[in-house]
């Protein structure tokens, strides 16, 4: 009965075509989740020492006396944060870890810009315990002084940069005035809520991959065995985490990953870990994304040559058009998640 209820909930989450749903009554809301525990943790990191900086006085609150601040001393740095939700009766054999992309945080997985439940809720309803992480330097993980501790300086994404990069529309279709923006005609991203999406953006560094990887590896050692779902910049961190701990990761799902391990990486180490890579629309017509995909396919070929399994879910090849780089936020996000869920079921990752 419990399995039937889960199947019914997943069916309710799947999108129907507008034509099919015009005269249909709204689906009843799914039953409440039976949650055992909600919590969080920080993992990884080190203690850094800052020396030689001048002290100064700062007033922290209006009307309060100034406080003398000495910026020299020891600081915890390079840690990462993760929040978890554990179910009363999970169907999945292992917890599911959701890792975000560049310039973003775990908010990616929580709620879509137009207010729909995100993949965190989808996979909870599918029966997974879910961990949502903020990479080192992002969100609730925090960042450190720069350049004294973090090398380089942060990069900030403008509101318009992602319009073309994330394949919402041509870059020339971006305009600060929402009424003048032009998206692709088949776009599934909720374009009317682009400004809401951009509020998720946070500073990022291009010089901290080693530290980010170390924190993700610490998370894997703390909470796994597990299944990892990664997006964009998170792709290479997930691939590398599997290389670093092949005994801990049971499967890896990469949603439009933007990077992969180098040619010299030992793909045989992950031959026992099933891999799935998911691609949205308009990859072939975009030179940047064409090169990205070629690099990922090179890594998939290496895994297969080593005797492992590396599959691809090409949504346009399946007749699903219009998906952007932000698949988990597109109008058919539940449909895509359902396909990922079925793949995990086919790999024996759910209890019978």
For every predicted segment, state its role.
Residues 110-130:
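Short amphipathic alpha-helix adjacent to the substrate-entry channel of hydrolases
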Residues 92-102:
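Short beta-strand element of the alpha/beta-hydrolase
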Residues 206-227:
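Conserved acidic catalytic loop of the alpha/beta-hydrolase fold
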Residues 254-315:
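The feature captures the conserved acid-bearing segment of alpha/beta-hydrolase catalytic domains
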Residues 100-112:
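Active-site glycine-rich loops that stabilize anionic/oxyanionic intermediates
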Residues 24-91:
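N-terminal cap/lid segment of alpha/beta-hydrolase-fold proteins
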Residues 229-238, 242:
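Gly/Ala-rich beta-loop-alpha elbow adjacent to hydrolase catalytic centers
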Residues 320-322, 326-352:
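Catalytic active-site module of serine/aspartate enzymes centered on a nucleophile-bearing elbow/loop
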């Amino acid at each position: 009965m419990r399995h039937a209820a889960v199947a019914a909930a997943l069916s309710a989450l799947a999108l129907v075509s507008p034509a099919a749903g015009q005269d249909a009554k709204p689906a009843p809301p799914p039953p409440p989740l039976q949650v055992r525990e909600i919590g969080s943790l920080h993992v990884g990191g080190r203690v850094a020492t800052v020396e030689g900086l001048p002290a100064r006085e700062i007033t922290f609150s209006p009307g309060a006396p100034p406080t003398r601040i000495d910026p020299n001393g020891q600081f915890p740095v390079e840690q990462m944060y993760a929040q978890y939700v554990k179910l009363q009766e999970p169907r999945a054999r292992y917890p599911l870890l959701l890792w975000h992309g560049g310039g973003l945080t775990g908010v990616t997985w929580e709620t879509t810009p137009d207010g729909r439940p995100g993949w965190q809720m989808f996979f909870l309803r599918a029966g997974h315990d879910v961990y949502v992480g903020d990479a080192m330097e992002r969100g609730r993980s925090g960042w450190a002084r720069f350049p004294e501790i973090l090398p380089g300086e942060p990069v900030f994404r403008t509101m318009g940069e992602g319009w073309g990069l994330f394949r919402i529309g041509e870059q020339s279709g971006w305009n600060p005035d929402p009424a003048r923006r032009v998206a692709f005609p088949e776009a599934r991203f909720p374009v009317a809520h682009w400004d809401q999406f951009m509020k998720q953006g946070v500073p990022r560094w291009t010089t901290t991959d080693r530290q980010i990887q170390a924190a993700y590896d610490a998370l894997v050692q703390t909470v796994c065995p597990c299944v990892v779902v990664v997006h964009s910049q998170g792709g290479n961190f997930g691939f590398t985490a599997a290389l670093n701990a092949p005994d801990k990761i049971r499967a890896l799902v990469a949603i439009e990953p933007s990077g992969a391990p180098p040619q010299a990486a030992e793909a045989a180490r992950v031959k026992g870990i099933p891999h799935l890579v998911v691609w949205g629309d308009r990859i072939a017509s975009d030179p940047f994304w064409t090169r990205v995909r070629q690099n990922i396919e090179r890594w998939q070929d290496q895994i297969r040559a080593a005797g492992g399994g590396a599959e691809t879910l090409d949504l346009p090849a399946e007749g699903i058009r219009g998906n952007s780089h932000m698949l988990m936020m597109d109008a058919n996000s539940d449909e895509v998640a359902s396909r990922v869920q079925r793949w995990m079921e086919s790999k024996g990752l759910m209890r019978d």
